[in-house]
Amino acid sequence: MKLVIAILSLVILALVLPVFFMPEPADLAIRQQQLPWVIEARPDGNTRALGLTLNVSTLADAKTAFGPDMVVAIVSEPGEVGALEAYVASAHAGFITGKLIFTARADEDMIAAMRERAAKTEYMESTTRKATLSPADLSTAMTLPVRAIAFIPSANLDRDAIVERFGAPADEIRANDHQTHLLYPDKGLDIILDTRGKELLQYVAPRDFARLTGPLGTAAQ
């Protein structure tokens, strides 16, 4: 009898517990909008991806959406002014986990001045340098709009999974023996399919797509 009661208790618990841990409808809607393949073209030529509107949503908006552990810094290679980036090491894009990098829209003069006032500069990998912003510049950076987003999913993606979620690409460019760029100019999306490493999803406004694909030697618009 005790065994029967114990089994019934476990069954009831299994049925009831999920109700308490189900996301609120509002939270569920937000997560669905943040899924990597939910991309909305806007009348102004921008796109909304991962729940953010490129060239409109700010780094502060990105921090609100993806958590307080966002690290903001200027990342540069030798001879370059660099880019103002925000990095989230562990993020949830809807129900998909991965790493996120947000690139802020800032001109070279602003970035150079921020580098001069940096609280700390250190090497990341090889010759790449990271400049930690001063408190005042960090406050300014958080008000700047996001012009590009890069997402590295934790799980490996294959071509079939990508086409199922994003549709067939408008063009493909093979960069080397293990990387292929799947291009979606209407969405402002470049997916790098990598047979040796992690896939990379790059989002920009469609009007900026030529800048993204320029280094690939393509005329995709």
Model-based region annotation:
Residues K2-P23:
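Hydrophobic membrane-insertion alpha-helices, especially the h-region
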Residues M22-E40:
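Ser/Thr/Pro/Gly-rich low-complexity linker/stalk segments immediately outside membranes or between
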Residues A26-I30, S57-Q221:
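A cross-family detector of function-defining hotspots
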Residues W37-L50, D137-R147:
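Acidic/histidine-rich, surface-exposed loop or edge segments in extracytoplasmic proteins
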